[in-house]
Amino acid sequence: MSVNTAATLYFGYVLTEEQVKSLPDEDFAYLMEELEFLHNTDCYREDYSSFIFGVRLGRTNDGIISINPHVDYPTYVKIIWYYEKYFNIKNEAPKHLLAHCWS
């Protein structure tokens, strides 16, 4: 995948499971660096899901970003799994997260 992975995540690019699996090592490492940065910012709250704001999430009018489980949950879980594997973190992925950091 010849893209700046983290940047495309910011713009709402949807990564499929196969695309995540096939990321070159360099792209995957860069993505993990970006996730770690978000993990350590003020936008990081009680969970680590804020990094995924651009990936298969929908923004509601009340400032909440929510998962669309009918379409998006498998990819969400897959990318969470990659995050857990890389950082050796185990946590329950929340269904909602505050979006003010991204507005």
Model-derived features with residue positions:
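Conserved GNAT acetyl-CoA-binding A-motif
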Residues: 96-97
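Acidic (Asp/Glu-rich) sequence patches and key acidic residues
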Residues: 1-81, 85-93, 102-103
